[in-house]
Amino acid sequence: MTLNQWQYGSKSEELVLQKYLEMDYKLIVQNFEYRLNHTAGRLGEIDLILEKDGRIYLVEVKARNNNKFGPVADQVNKNKMAYIYKTYRYFIIQREYRKYREAFFQFDLAIVFKNEVKIIPNAATFDYY
């Protein structure tokens, strides 16, 4: 059975989440969306937000079965980072997540290629925002 693109992406996120959980990370939220209201379109999304030892990890999951469109990591550019940072700023002002406002955070990129997970810790910085 072949998976469609959405199913493969969802399965890949679960593989990455399992890997983080095995390393004693705690899941805060999966697929956090930045929306101003329920009728407006999505303004941002973070695949996984995790916590370990007081640090917050923002994880972008990229999954591919081939390199037809070039290396997966190349798809996380400055615009994508701005999108993630904007979403993170929205995340920390939400009532249930305010306790994380003072926490140090980092961005990890998780690449799933042919069902193999590779995590690139601290893959990029938010210095230019």
Predicted stretch roles:
Residues 1-35:
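Acidic-basic catalytic patches of nuclease active cores, encompassing PD-(D/E)XK
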Residues 3-6, 14, 63-115:
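Catalytic cores of nucleic-acid endonucleases
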Residues 26-56:
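Active-site metal-binding core of divalent-cation-utilizing nuclease and nuclease-like domains
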Residues 46-67, 84:
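Conserved catalytic cores of phosphodiester-cleaving nucleases, focusing on short active-site segments
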Residues 51-52, 100, 105, 128-129:
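Positively charged, solvent-exposed patches that mediate nucleic-acid binding
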Residues 55-57, 108, 118:
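Protein kinase-like catalytic core scaffold
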Residues 112-129:
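Short, low-complexity, polybasic intrinsically disordered segments
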